[in-house]
Amino acid sequence: MIGSNLSRRERAADARAIGTEGKRWIRSWINVFRCETEARIPQDEAALQRLVCEGRYSCVGQSHSYNGVQVVPGVTAMLMREGGLKTLAYDPASETVRVGASVSVRELKLFLRDGRGRGLLNSGNYMEQSVIGALATGTHGFGPRAVMADSVVELTFLDGAGRRVTLRRGDPDFAHVALSFGTIAPIIELVLETKPLEPYVSVSSMSRLSKLAELKQGAIAANWAVMPYTDPEDPVIMLHALAECDKGVEPTAHPEAKGGGGHFAKWFLKHYYNFDRFLPWFRRPMQRFIDWLDLKQSERVVTDPQDLDYLYDPKPGLKENRAPSITRGLFSTTYTGYNLAFFVPVEKAPAVVKFIIREADALRDLGFYLKGIISVRELPGTAGPVFAANARQPMAAIDLFADPRDYAWLERLQRLVMHYEPDTRPHFGKSALGPDFRAALNSDGQDHLEQLMDIYTRHFPQGNLMFSERVRAMLDVGQPLAGESAADAGLA
C-alpha cells in the first residue's frame, strides 16, 4: 500500500494474509477507514455463486479507494482481485477485450500490448487495481474518453440468487450499472473497447496559471497541477499536455529540461518530496521560495507507445506510477498523503483552485497544510454512464492531498466548494460521499439514484449485497450496518 501509515507489524500481517480466507482487515488506501471482517476468495464463478447465496456480502477489488467505499463492517468481503476469475480474451473482429473480475490493470495492459498492439482508451496510472474495481468507482485519466467506464460495451454480474445477468450498451439499465460504485455486484466480466497503441507529443511545462490557455493550445489532453502556497493571484503551475503525433516519429530519449533557475532550481525540484514529507510546516516557505525563483521550464518528447502508462509518463520504457520528469519531485508527494477528489465544470477549475488556495491558507493557524500540489485533470466531451463525472458536460477532476491525519480538512474544503459550485460531482473512490451530492447527480431532472436503487431492488430482493456507510448516506437508504464500536456501545 503506497504511503500507508501502518506499523511494520501491521504491514507484515497484511502481507501474510494475502490469499487467505477468514478474519482479515479491509482498509482504505492510506488506512484512514478500516474494519476487520470475514474474507472469502472466490476461485471460480461457481464458488462465487455459492458465496453470494450464503448471506450478506460486499465486493472488494485492490482496495485502492481512499474514502472507505470498500469498507463495510459486519458482512463477508469477497476479495475479487485475489480470486480466480481471470478471463482475458481479445476479439479482433470487434476490437474489444473480455476481462474477468480478478484481472489487474497491469495484466490487462500487458495482454493487449504484447502480440496485439492494442491499449485501453484511457486509464488511471495505478497498475495493481482490479480492472472492474477501477471502472466501478469512476477511475479516469485525462483527455478524450477519460472515464474508464465509458469504454464498457457489455457487463455481466451475479444477482442476489447467484444468477448471471448480462447488460449491453443500449439496454435500459446499462448506463446506470456500468459505473455503479459497488451497488450492483459482483460484476464478474466486462467487455471493453480498445484502440491501437500510438505515440503522443508530450510537453511538460512549469509556468503560471495565467499562461494555462496559451500552453494548452493544440493539446488533446491536459493535466495540470498548482502549487497552493505560491502567488494566490497567479500561482505556479506544472502542465502535462499531450498532442497527436506523426506515426513515423521515433520515441526520443529524455532531453534536459529547458528554462530558468539553473542547477540549484533543478536540484531543489528533484528533492522537494523529501522536504515536504519530513518538514510539513516548511511547505509554505518552500513554495514561496519557488514562487520567488519564478521558474519557467519545459520539455518536449515523443512518448513510447509500448509504455504501460503512456498517458502519464513521457519517458520511453516501462516506467509507471510517476509524473513527467521536471515535476516528479513535486508529484511524488501524492504517494504519501490522503487524496480527496471531486469534479467541477472544466471552465470553473481555475476559479475553484484559487478559492481552495485562499481557504487552505487561512487554516494555517490551526496547523493544516495542503500537501505538495492541487492536481487538475481535464475530462473533455461527455461520457455514456450516467454517474460518470462528465456525463452531462466537460469536467475537471480536482485532487487535493494532505497528511492522513488531516483528511477531515480536505472534506471541509470539498463542502465549501459545493456551497458555491452546485454542479460539483463526486469521485466515488475519493470524495467525501453524502446526501449533498444527490442534487448534482440528479441535475438533469431525473432521479438517477432512485433508478439505481430500483435496479438494485429488482436484482437483489434478498438484500444480501451491502454497501458502505457513505454510499448509504448518499443514497438515503437508511442507517449503515453497525460496526464493532457501535454494537459494543449499544448505539445500534
What does each of the following model-derived ranges do?
Residues M1-R27, S485-A492:
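Intrinsically disordered, low-structural-confidence terminal and linker regions
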Residues R27-N122, A134, G138-F142:
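Glycine-rich N-terminal segment of FAD-binding domains in flavoprotein oxidoreductases
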Residues G61, A222-M227, R322, N339-L340, ...:
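A short glycine-rich, hydrophobically flanked beta-strand micro-motif that places a catalytic Asp/Glu
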Residues N67-T87, G141-G162, P186-E193:
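Structural signature of FAD isoalloxazine-binding scaffolds in flavoprotein oxidoreductases
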Residues R116-N125, R163-L167, P199-Y200, A221-N223, ...:
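Short secondary-structure capping/junction motifs at helix and strand boundaries
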Residues A136, V153-A351, F355-R358, L370:
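C-terminal substrate-binding/cap subdomain adjacent to the FAD-binding core in PCMH-type
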Residues I326-R328, A408-A492:
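Activity-critical C-terminal alpha-helical subdomain
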Residues P345, V353-L400:
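C-terminal structural cap/anchor segments
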